[in-house]
Amino acid sequence: MRKRAILFGLFLLPSIVTFALNNSDAQWIDKVANFYGERAGKRVAAWRNVVTESAELSELEKLSAVNNFFNQLYFVNDIDLWGKKDYWATPLEFLGSAAGDCEDFSIAKYFTLRELGIDDKKLRLVYVKAIKLNQFHMVVAYYPSPSSEPVLLDNIDPEIKQASKRRDLLPVYSFNGSRLWLMKERGRGELAGNSSRLGLWNDLRARMGSVKLNRPIKNYDG
């Protein structure tokens, strides 16, 4: 019930936009509103507001702002939302649908942090096994420096924690915009090639480039 109340507030938050929209922002908001509905457009406006207001924050503050924003959305499995076993939604599709699974939460956070200027070398999308839930899961890892332990942004546990504190997660592989790693331990892993080896990643990037939107099979927008 509490999450529903928070999310309802997110839907209404940008009813009066308090920042100057650039052309891309305005086009995204209009496109999403026309495709998914007015409330969806307001969520995109709220996202752009977070990006604008977070621009001058420290990197750790940016992590917190982005993690908190996206964790307000609903968790729904791909088969229930998209009618597919596995579908990686773009950030606009995620916000437009008001729901997504762990990959959608992580992808939206990753691209927002990249937009906020965090170097790709510091970020990874990490595919893990959630031991307690006995299912595969995805989180975002942030490395403050090349040799440091990462912290994890997650939708299951909303508190940003060091990877060593997440004994409930077993890493499998990780990737970012250019590289793919196999995870042999809770560290950085072994380089296994380019992220272009991942078909779902390539499909996602193509849809982002063309700003293509797909419609979910079920409406979670209130």
Question: What positions do the PLM features span?
Answer:
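Bacterial N-terminal signal peptides that target proteins for export
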Residues: M1-L7
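N-terminal signal peptide c-region/cleavage motif recognized by signal peptidases
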Residues: S15-V17
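A structural boundary/capping signal
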Residues: F19-G222
